[in-house]
From Swiss-Prot:
This is tRNA (guanine-N(7)-)-methyltransferase. It comes from Mycoplasmopsis synoviae (strain 53). GO terms for cellular component: tRNA methyltransferase complex. It is an enzyme of class 2 (transferase). Pfam families: Methyltransf_4. The keyword Transmembrane does not apply. InterPro entries: SAM-dependent_MTases_sf, tRNA_(Gua-N-7)_MeTrfase_Trmb, tRNA_methyltr_TrmB_bact.
């Protein structure tokens, strides 16, 4: 369900300690970035479990990003930052390199005319390549949408990414033990299988 637009969201975010306002913003190798974080359910739990690591939730819609701010306050997090930069402009707004980027339950944009909006379209993958440090850095994706997952697999391969791990059933894989389940996953895990992959940029990226 889409959130009703909150016209005060951006001004509230601008007053928040952990909202990134000044760019370019310097990221570090051990920072964890999540692109299209939505309400921040997964990244907030990751930040809670790893208090000595910095996390950056990138969500372009202020109304949605405000939900992340609320989670930060509720959990008393000191290591989760919010950015409302559009994912198509990451290379213009961030300097430095990271070893980890996540996409979690991204909008699949199923209609063909919306292909360029999918977060695994070539132009977005190029942005992630720019931010990832090297071929040992990891790009993680999990989704319950099979069509989006298959599209992402094809797009990654066509754009010179290496697939390190691929499964159509995350909860019955070797990565289930470390997987942080969102409320959606917990609610539907008996009925819906979660697709998951780990990729890295190719040698010539």
């Amino acid at each position: 369900m889409r959130l009703r637009n909150d016209k005060f969201a951006l001004s509230e975010l601008n007053e928040f300690k952990f909202f990134i306002k000044n760019y370019p913003f310097n990221i570090k190798e051990d920072d964890i970035l999540e692109i299209g974080s939505g309400k921040g359910e997964m990244i907030s739990q990751m930040a809670l479990l790893n208090p000595n690591q910095r996390f950056i939730a990138i969500e372009k819609y202020p109304t949605v990003a405000k939900k992340i701010m609320q989670k930060i306050k509720e959990l008393n997090l000191e290591n989760l930052y919010i950015s409302c930069i559009d994912a198509s402009k990451l290379s213009e707004n961030f300097i430095g390199k990271t070893n980890t980027i996540w996409l979690t339950f991204s909008d699949p944009w199923p209609k063909k005319r919306h292909e360029k909006r999918r977060l695994t379209y070539k132009s977005f993958l190029d942005q992630y390549k720019f931010l990832l440090k090297d071929k040992n850095s990891n790009f993680y994706l999990k989704t319950d949408n099979d069509l989006f997952f298959n599209y992402s697999l094809e797009s990654l391969q066509e754009n010179n990414w290496n697939l390190k791990f691929v499964t159509g059933d995350l909860h019955n894989s070797i990565y289930n033990e470390t997987n942080i389940k969102t409320g959606y996953e917990i609610k539907w895990m008996d009925k819906t299988k979660i697709n998951f992959l780990i990729a890295s940029k190719g040698e010539n990226a």
